[in-house]
Design a protein with these regions (language model features):
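Conserved HGGG/HGGXW glycine-rich cap/lid loop of the alpha/beta-hydrolase fold
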Residues: 40-90
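Flexible "cap/lid" loop of the alpha/beta hydrolase fold
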Residues: 130-138, 143-172
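Hydrophobic, aromatic-rich cap/lid helix
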Residues: 190-218
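Acidic catalytic loop of the alpha/beta-hydrolase fold
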Residues: 234-238, 264-265
Length: 279
């Protein structure tokens, strides 16, 4: 039995849905399997091969389909590598390197080496934001710019890891779709497909449940490359005001944006991130 999936049938259902979503990838793409010490890592590469590289890291309980709405714009000016995080419901190995240790950075070292990258800009969401920030702290010479969407590790975490409490306990009838709407802040009508996908995933997938390590002020102060932090004011996972304050106070070249009326799921930031990456 898999450690991250509840059943083989569930694994197959998630994989089938992922393949369906990947068929919507709007630009030319190379599907790569990069060997790492944690097992093979699945990477989607789009954009001109000689363009500046950008690495995308999605959140927990997700995969690189996260970036379907962004990739066409970003891949015009950049060589974009959408990396499926190991231990998450995508195409990468099921290993889960221990957070707060060198293990995650060593995995990313292998990914970058396999892609023949000495450095790149990073865009990370939630757990992917934590991962990108951890890499910037540990490998500052390998991160040229850092865009973080609802990142973990800066502001206080309100709940155990993603969706755990709400999905397990909030509703006696275990209405995963409605619970996902509350956690993400997405509307049941306007974002029905996204919430259906979240419900499918958490029906069959066991997420990380531990709290994310929080970076110290001293660690954040070493992140001297340009940083863009975007958070939702109504995030129920992390204290967004705390995230914005600490990022502004501790990181020398950070720009922070707090989006009113937005929860943990931050959509529609294609243009601001592209502008940041182009500077």
């Amino acid at each position: 039995m898999s450690a991250i999936y509840k059943s083989e049938a569930g694994r197959a259902a998630i994989a089938a849905r992922y393949q369906e979503l990947l068929r919507r990838w709007p630009v030319a793409v190379e599907q790569l399997h990069v060997p790492t010490r944690e097992g093979d890592t699945f990477v989607l590469a789009s954009g001109p091969k000689d363009a500046p590289p950008v690495v995308l890291l999605h959140g927990s309980g997700s995969n690189s389909s996260t970036w379907l709405g962004d990739i066409a714009s970003w891949a015009t000016d950049f060589r974009v590598y959408a990396v499926d995080m190991v231990g998450e419901p995508g195409g990468s190995a099921e290993a889960r390197p221990e957070l707060g240790t060198e293990a995650v950075a060593l995995w990313l070292d292998d990914v970058l080496a396999g892609l023949d990258l000495s450095a790149a800009s990073f865009v990370g969401m939630s757990l992917g934001g934590w991962t990108a920030l951890d890499y910037a702290v540990r490998r500052p010479d390998k991160v040229t710019k850092l865009a973080l969407l609802c990142p973990g590790g800066i502001g206080k975490q309100k709940f155990g890891w993603i969706f755990k409490n709400l999905l397990d306990h909030l509703f006696s009838n275990h209405d995963l779709r409605r619970s996902a709407a509350i956690v993400t802040g997405l509307n049941l009508t306007d974002h029905a497909e996204i919430l259906d996908d979240v419900a499918l995933t958490f029906t069959h997938f066991n997420p990380r449940t531990g709290k994310l390590p929080v970076f110290t002020d001293a660690q954040l102060s070493t992140v001297t490359m340009p940083v863009l932090v975007i958070v939702g004011a109504d995030d129920v996972m992390f204290k967004s005001a705390d995230t914005a304050r600490r990022a502004s106070d501790s990181m020398p070249d950070a720009t922070t944006r707090v989006l009113p009326g937005v929860g943990h799921a931050i959509l529609g930031q294609t243009a601001p991130i592209l502008e940041f990456l182009r500077k």
